[in-house]
């Protein structure tokens, strides 16, 4: 009889830069959408959200909203999140780090 091994949960950190022309309600909706993508995750935690001046211009933007989140997941969850962030036009940049 085969025993199935459980996939280990891995800690990740998402740093996401959102366009500065969005209001607080739109930012909240974007964060909720990301949390919905991560619903399979064991843990999702919003660590911070700030507006900062960028070190260099990205497109026409000189500042942006930084969002930092932590979550536990594995490959399929991370790929699903990356796919969502790549097609999302409200985000400028993102980085997913394994902790």
UniProtKB/Swiss-Prot annotation:
Protein purpose: Binds together with bS18 to 16S ribosomal RNA.
NCBIfam families per UniProt: S6
Principal location class: plastid
Gene Ontology biological process terms in this record: translation
KW Metal-binding (keyword) present: no
Gene3D superfamilies per the UniProt record, alphabetical: 3.30.70.60
Alphabetical UniProt keywords: Chloroplast, Plastid, Ribonucleoprotein, Ribosomal protein, RNA-binding, rRNA-binding
Pfam families in UniProt: Ribosomal_S6
This protein's GO CC annotations: chloroplast; ribonucleoprotein complex; ribosome
Name the record gives this protein: Small ribosomal subunit protein bS6c
Family of this protein: Belongs to the bacterial ribosomal protein bS6 family.
Organism for this UniProt entry: Cyanidioschyzon merolae (strain NIES-3377 / 10D)
UniProt-listed SUPFAM superfamilies: Ribosomal protein S6
rRNA-binding keyword on record: yes
Cellular localization per UniProt: Plastid, Chloroplast
InterPro entries reported in the protein's UniProt record: Ribosomal_bS6, Ribosomal_bS6_sf, Ribosomal_S6_plastid/chlpt, Transl_elong_EF1B/ribsomal_bS6
């Amino acid at each position: 009889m085969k025993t199935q091994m459980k996939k280990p949960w891995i800690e990740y950190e998402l740093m996401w830069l959102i366009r500065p022309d969005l209001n607080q309600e739109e930012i909240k909706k974007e964060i909720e959408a990301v949390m919905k993508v991560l619903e399979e995750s064991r843990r999702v935690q919003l660590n911070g959200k700030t507006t900062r001046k960028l070190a260099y211009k990205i497109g026409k933007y000189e500042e942006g909203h930084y969002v930092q989140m932590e979550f536990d997941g594995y490959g399929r969850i991370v790929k699903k999140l990356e796919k969502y962030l790549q097609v999302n036009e409200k985000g400028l940049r993102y980085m997913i780090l394994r902790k």
